[in-house]
Amino acid sequence: MTILRLNGGKILNEKVHEIGVIAMGSYLENHGSALPIDTDIKIASYVSLMACIKTGAKFLGTVIPSTEYSYVKHGIHNKVSDIVEYLTFLLTWAKRIGIKKVIIVNCHGGNILAEKEIKELENLINIKIKFLSFPLTHAATEELSIGYVIGIANKEKMKEHKPENYAEIGMVGLREAREKNKEIDEEAKRVEKEGVKIDEELGKKLLDEFINKVVNEITNFL
């Protein structure tokens, strides 16, 4: 049997090989004109991978299914049970490569609906799970700014990236969602008042905060 050189490379210590990071977001959601439909999962993947590079933890990939509140209609989503099924497969294989603790980095608000069921997998699979969520106002300034920093936002399309053109921006035009969810309505009102823009400094600041939070959780797991 091959003996692995666990102390190789730039890592916090050898125990970090027992920690995995999984990105969770959404692959199929409209995000106006300046951001791609898979913005959430790309941001979550970037944050997850950077935290792993900084610490030596293992980036275990992404959760493909996502879920959403029934009244938020801006994409194609799945059932909570689909997420649980996919994660069960992923976590079972993670254990086979020595993973004992996992941090799930979620950048899609709707996935919070699955948090309880995800935590229940701890006992089912016998693996420690930390669920970290970084919700951002949909397709608005924060997401635009982060997207620009990581290279997925198209600045040339910002002229048309407005709520009056795309209802999902800030969820301003998603009337049912605003009526049924107070937080969504408050965010939409803020977007109506302030508009949306790309702020590179804000994007860098938020990315650093998110990455550092994941790094801290990895450190706490050691």
UniProtKB/Swiss-Prot annotation:
Reaction catalysis annotation: 2-amino-5-formylamino-6-(5-phospho-D-ribosylamino)pyrimidin-4(3H)-one + H2O = 2,5-diamino-6-(1-D-ribosylamino)pyrimidin-4(3H)-one 5'-phosphate + formate + H(+)
Class of this enzyme: hydrolase
SUPFAM superfamilies: Creatininase
UniProt similarity note: Belongs to the creatininase superfamily. FAPy deformylase family.
Single GO term (MF): ferrous iron binding
Positions that bind Fe cation 1: E29, D40, H108
Protein name: 2-amino-5-formylamino-6-ribosylaminopyrimidin-4(3H)-one 5'-monophosphate deformylase
Gene3D superfamilies assigned: Creatininase
Pathway(s) the chain acts in: Cofactor biosynthesis; coenzyme F420 biosynthesis; Cofactor biosynthesis; riboflavin biosynthesis
Residues at which Fe cation 2 binds: H31, D40
Keywords for this protein: Hydrolase, Iron, Metal-binding, Zinc
Cofactor, how bound (note): Requires one Fe(2+) ion for activity. Requires an additional second metal ion that could be Fe(2+) or Zn(2+).
Complexes and interactors: Homodimer.
Transmembrane segments: none
GO biological process: F420-0 metabolic process; riboflavin biosynthetic process
Function per UniProt: Catalyzes the hydrolysis of the formamide of 2-amino-5-formylamino-6-ribosylamino-4(3H)-pyrimidinone 5'-monophosphate (FAPy) to form 2,5-diamino-6-ribosylamino-4(3H)-pyrimidinone 5'-phosphate (APy).
Cofactor: Fe(2+); Zn(2+)
Pfam family, one: Creatininase
The enzyme's E.C. designation: 3.5.1.102
